[in-house]
């Protein structure tokens, strides 16, 4: 299953100490294949992920480990979707 995860930082100052660990978390799950794509919003108030997960329950367990979640300084909205087409230039 594929999920779009919209992450919104609710308190920028409170989030600052968690950002290095959050980036490490993102990279670790990208390297192991859980996260297909991730990036920050240009305005700096969060970002989004495309995640491969077996179920919404396993996705929620994965998201609970995010340092921003542990710091209670961000919110998450998750939406399941089906890929219809994908370009090769996503990183441009």
Segments (PLM) and residue ranges:
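Conserved, structured core segments of small domains
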Residues: 1-92
């Amino acid at each position: 299953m594929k999920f779009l995860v919209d992450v919104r930082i609710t308190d920028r100052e409170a989030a600052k100490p968690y950002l290095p660990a959050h980036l490490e978390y993102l990279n670790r799950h990208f390297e192991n294949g859980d996260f297909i794509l991730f990036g920050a919003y240009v305005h700096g108030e969060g970002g989004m992920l495309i995640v491969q997960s077996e179920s919404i329950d396993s996705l929620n367990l994965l998201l609970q480990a995010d340092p921003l979640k542990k710091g209670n300084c961000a919110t998450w909205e998750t939406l399941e979707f089906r890929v219809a087409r994908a370009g090769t230039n996503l990183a441009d």
